[in-house]
Amino acid sequence: MVPKLFTSQICLLLLLGPLGVEGSLHAKPRQFSWAQWFSIQHIQMAPLRCTYAMRAINKYERRCKNQNTFLHTTFADVVNVCGNTNMTCPRNASLHNCHHSRVQVPLTYCNLTGPPTISNCVYSSTQANMFYVVACDNRDPRDSPQYPVVPVHLDTII
């Protein structure tokens, strides 16, 4: 059982590794803070089919986003990761506001499979349990004062 699970995880890393994580530091809709946009793009408590789940993101971006990762955890749990030790962001060495999760979380990786027509974006789904790295910043005035530091970018999954 262990070799099969290990092999599956290696295959998933090989699949996801070169693709990276298309992060939330791309243009965001003006009406949202970076933390709000992070939540819309990456927090989803229960797994949904990617084609359905991506509709909200694509509606705001007015395009079919190539790939996206949904963490099946709470915003509060990701905020807690912001309290972990600062590190250089793996995907952007000029940023030093990243934080590595201490526990793996269930996630869904969505990959655009069909032609990118905004009226019909079709995605494949890959489920996994993985660690993640997020960039965090001080909250925007539009964010809840409950959290002084908030996640703003999903840098990578490991």
From Swiss-Prot:
It comes from Saimiri sciureus (Common squirrel monkey). The modification 3'-nitrotyrosine is found at residue 60. One of its GO terms (molecular function) is nucleic acid binding. Glycans are attached at residues 34, 86, 92, 111. Substrate binds at residues 65-69. Its EC number is 4.6.1.18. InterPro entries: RNaseA, RNaseA-like_dom_sf, RNaseA_AS, RNaseA_domain. The lineage of its organism: Eukaryota, Metazoa, Chordata, Craniata, Vertebrata. Belongs to the pancreatic ribonuclease family. This is Non-secretory ribonuclease. It is found in: Lysosome; Cytoplasmic granule.
